[in-house]
């Protein structure tokens, strides 16, 4: 968001967690977070969610409608949880592209998938979600899991995803969202701002990255706002499903 107190030539600012920073600095700061946590990313996901993130991702796979021969783009694919399942679904005649802007996360994902024997129909691309380096009307399905909140210009990223989808193609956005009850919200806040940074300190020696995680979730658009953004970008039949009381939401939209 722009700061109206600054002159017309001043660089626009945006949020990095609860901080207000120049737009050009956000990508650098986000990159530093993920360079720091990449090696322990999977372990922390299991610890933070009690393993429930695997159920959230399984539901994403089920709702994707991906089948044999499809071409899938997994944006912010990180350590490859979704890519691994999509690779199995699309088979040898299909293709999965794991894209991530962060080189450290991309390396961890590539190494992990190769160790598990996932190859042949998977490729790895370092890419910015706002400027996807793929042709128009190219993919049957695009997913972004726990990545959109880190993007500086979310509206541009959503339009970029629309562009690379084929007509009738599906976008699925899996992201932390707004809990549906005030009681759950209070408990979630206590966990996020107290236990999460402590866990990050103990496991990765980096409390600040997990403090940013908690703050970035609160700054991310809520369920209805993100739905409206997808409609505004040009998606049809946009719906969302709350999971774990709205702590996580899965949005789905179709390209006309």
Curated annotation (Swiss-Prot):
It catalyses: a 2-demethylmenaquinol + S-adenosyl-L-methionine = a menaquinol + S-adenosyl-L-homocysteine + H(+); a 2-methoxy-6-(all-trans-polyprenyl)benzene-1,4-diol + S-adenosyl-L-methionine = a 5-methoxy-2-methyl-3-(all-trans-polyprenyl)benzene-1,4-diol + S-adenosyl-L-homocysteine + H(+). It is an enzyme of class 2 (transferase). Keywords: Menaquinone biosynthesis, Methyltransferase, S-adenosyl-L-methionine, Transferase, Ubiquinone biosynthesis. Pathway: Quinol/quinone metabolism; menaquinone biosynthesis; menaquinol from 1,4-dihydroxy-2-naphthoate: step 2/2; Cofactor biosynthesis; ubiquinone biosynthesis. PROSITE patterns: SAM_MT_UBIE, UBIE_1, UBIE_2. Transmembrane segments: none annotated. The keyword Chaperone does not apply. Signal peptide: none annotated. It comes from the Bacteria. The keyword Mitochondrion does not apply. GO terms for molecular function: 2-methoxy-6-polyprenyl-1,4-benzoquinol methyltransferase activity; demethylmenaquinone methyltransferase activity. Its EC number is 2.1.1.163, 2.1.1.201. Pfam families: Ubie_methyltran (PF01209). Methyltransferase required for the conversion of demethylmenaquinol (DMKH2) to menaquinol (MKH2) and the conversion of 2-polyprenyl-6-methoxy-1,4-benzoquinol (DDMQH2) to 2-polyprenyl-3-methyl-6-methoxy-1,4-benzoquinol (DMQH2). Belongs to the class I-like SAM-binding methyltransferase superfamily. MenG/UbiE family. This is Ubiquinone/menaquinone biosynthesis C-methyltransferase UbiE. The gene is ubiE.
């Amino acid at each position: 968001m722009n700061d109206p107190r600054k002159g017309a030539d001043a660089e626009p600012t945006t949020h990095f967690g609860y901080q207000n920073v120049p737009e050009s600095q956000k990508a650098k700061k986000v990159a530093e977070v993920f360079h720091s946590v990449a090696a322990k990313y999977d372990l922390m996901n299991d610890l933070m969610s009690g393993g429930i993130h695997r159920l959230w991702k399984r539901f994403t796979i089920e709702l994707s409608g991906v089948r044999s021969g499809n071409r899938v783009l997994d944006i912010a694919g990180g350590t490859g949880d979704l890519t691994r399942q999509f690779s199995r679904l699309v088979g040898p005649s299909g293709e999965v592209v794991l894209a991530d802007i962060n080189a450290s996360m991309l390396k961890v994902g590539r190494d992990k998938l190769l160790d598990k024997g996932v190859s042949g129909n998977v490729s790895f691309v370092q890419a910015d979600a706002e400027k996807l380096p793929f042709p128009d009307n190219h993919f049957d399905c695009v997913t972004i899991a726990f990545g959109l909140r880190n993007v500086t210009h979310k509206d541009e990223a959503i339009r970029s995803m629309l562009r690379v989808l084929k007509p009738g193609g599906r976008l699925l956005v899996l992201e932390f969202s707004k809990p549906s009850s005030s009681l759950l919200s209070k408990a979630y806040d206590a966990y996020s701002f107290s236990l999460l940074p402590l866990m990050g300190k103990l496991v990765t020696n980096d409390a600040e990255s997990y403090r940013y995680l908690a703050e970035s979730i609160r700054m991310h658009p809520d369920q209805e706002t993100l739905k409206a953004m997808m409609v505004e970008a040009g998606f049809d039949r946009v719906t969302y499903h709350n999971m774990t009381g709205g702590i996580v939401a899965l949005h789905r939209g179709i390209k006309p």
